Amino acid sequence: MNNLFSKMLGCALASTLLPLQFAYAQIEKDLPKNHVVSLTFHDVRDDVLKEGDRDIYAIQTKNLAQFFDWLSQSEWKPIRLKDIEEARKQGKELPHNAILLTFDDGALSSYSRIFPLLKQYQIPAVFALPTSWLNGNTKAGYEAYGQGNLVNWKQVREMQVSGLAEFASHSDDLHHGVLANPQGNEQPAATSYMYLKSQARYETDAEYQQRILNDLKKSHDVLKKELGVEPKAIVWPYGAVNQQLEKIAQQAGFNFSFSLGRDGVNQINDVTFKRSLMVDNSTAEQLSETLLNILNSAEKDLYKQPKHFVSMDLKQLAALSNTQSDEKLGLLLSKLYSLKNNTLILKPLDDQDGDGQDDVAYFPTTQMPVKQDILNRSLWQAQTRAGQAVILELPIYPQKNKPFLVADLAKDIARFNSNLSGIQLNAGTALNCAMQNTTLNESNCVQQVKQLSQLNQLTQKAAKPYLNMSNQAQFSLLLTPDLEHIEQLPALLKSLLTQNDLVNLKFNMVGKQKQFKQALELLNTLDAKYKQRIMLTLTLPENDQKNAWQEVKQGLFDIQRIGIQKFGVDGYSPKNSKSVHQYLYNPMSLNSSSVMYQPFAGLANEGKK
């Protein structure tokens, strides 16, 4: 772009700007020094539709220009990566209200539209480049942005000379999916262990780590060669990053990692920085509101989100072939899509011989025989087809003679399912002694609580290195209280929530309505901050008796009335799915419009099979 055109574009954009008015969100409380928020953009075009554009990540040139105009007059202070590095190493403080702007993928608009705006407003930004896209591996880039619509190294160097543009790696060639299960799903290349179809196996840890390290080193070396400076950051494609990847990135020479789609405030010593993903062609006013929301909510809003869930055994989707299993999965997802809940809890182990101990798994593991490898496929399809957050439930003691087995199983689950939404440990009645007035301080009970707490922490430690940080996976503990003896339940919950994101209480309340309501009255004494982190599960009736189903329905409504918004049912199956839809749709569904009601998506007479 020549200077004359740059000036003309700047003048044209300036004429479209809106005056700074009261509609823009104003900071009421400053972001502290040495803290930073980050917004992420992608392509910038003149013709982005106000709604329903072909690219949900694109923003209209006018909207970005108006945002820059507002930003330059606001209390926000745009900073560089260099500023964060100096704050880390030299103790040079970041200003109040620091903001880091990032643009991913290296679309041509980085040079033709964003760069002129940076110069006009003297605002710095970071651009994340998939280096192989600039070196001829253009297929994925052209599919995303169109033929020839990527920046080249000459343009990148011109931007760098201005001092307003810094460049980070977006990997060399990890901006795509890789085969992640035998059924054929492709998932983010960085966090997924590849399924090697010709060998009918997954990558080993060593193979996976070497593949990622080789890619990052190559991208690092390309950026250093082309730009003459040591690159500082890796911006992970799709925001897919975990603790294992953080360490590999540091080996490759990257001191900063960036995730995606996760709102929050960053501190200068964070290893991975959260970035808020801008979508749907946000206006300047909406972008200013986004910044204010980040300041006001931060991480604590994570617990305010409702969870309406069904819990089921994964073995119900098993079959003699993957094709037959897929048919079962497809029908399940159709039913959940009709129900309009938002969370699915799967139990991926099974007790085949009925001895009370789990002896087979439905995911790749060396800890016990694998009956069928269907967990990853089920999880991915539930997320992408039915909009379900998927939580995996493991018994605290799958096998009594192996006290630490659950931690090893959780590790394998997380390795091959980095995008899961949570892991729930089922402690059953193990802590019921701590809910009773008379036994709270007895030595046996205290020891039992201590052992379970240690095992819980060990399990979290085993799984966390593999979980995608952008997904904000949560750890929960499932308890089955005795409704007759729960005097100390509130005190126990407060204690457990110091080690768990959530605590789930399961009740079989059919025929015990009085005791159940008393339990709810006890839970209602808790402050809202605790209620936000409590899940309640009701066991489904084993028969079709209308009265029993009506009791469960009323129980779910009663849960809502005391301000608990995370609730669901256990024992979901093809046989009772129609009854769930018939009796429990109103409390379970998150559908707020009768116009959007979906009828039951089951096959005729399926429940009679």
Stretches with model-predicted labels:
Residues G52-A65, W70-K77, L81-E166, L174-H176, ...:
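Active-site beta->alpha N-cap acidic-glycine motif
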Residues L100-D105, I345-Q352, D408-C445, N504, ...:
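Active-site groove signature of glycoside hydrolases
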Residues W76-E86, L94, N135, L339-Q372:
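Aromatic-lined carbohydrate-binding/catalytic grooves of carbohydrate-active enzymes
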Residues P130, L134, S192-D205, E226-E230, ...:
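His/Asp/Glu-enriched short active-site or ligand-binding loop at hydrolase and phosphoryl-transfer sites
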